[in-house]
Amino acid sequence: GVQTCALPILKAGRNQDAWRLNTPCENIVIRHCDILKGHTLLGIGSEMSGGVRNVYMHNCTAPDSVFRLFFAKTNHRRGGFIENIWMKNVKAGKMQRVLEVDTDVLYQWRDLVPTYQDSITFINGLYMDSVTCDRTEAVYDLKGDARLPIKNVEIRNVTVGEVTKFVKNVVNAENVVEENIIYKEKQDKQ
């Protein structure tokens, strides 16, 4: 388990090396972690070709400012899997996204290095429950790959003080369940 740390980021190797080793990052409990400022409270990837599964994060905070509370990122070169990831009882300040999954993260490598082999990441079972934050641009943003959509996402009991751009965006995702998402939309000043 991981506890009382400041930056929980889970990785599981990149491309051929990770596929050859076949050693997933798995069975991890993350609790009582506080991140003051940074990119993400719980980050998975993009180096996750060996797979990440069975992660339970609970009772953590991001009181100031982060880009995302929970961010899973991969691309069509990575392969591997992301499955059975839980985030529960989290309190946060302001951010861009409460939950984001992006399956097309290549940054500068998109044009610098050619794709020799497509290997789509299997993403199944992402669960978020009892999350409170002050302000976000969006509650959740799920961008799956059409060839292997994201499956089984549950977002429950999320309270946001203010949403400034949009509540949700879902592309290539199946069985997305939301329950009891409470938010206030940004009011334009007259």
Which positions does each model-derived feature cover?
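Surface-exposed loop/turn motifs in large extracellular/passenger domains
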Residues: 15-33, 48-62, 75-91, 108-132, ...
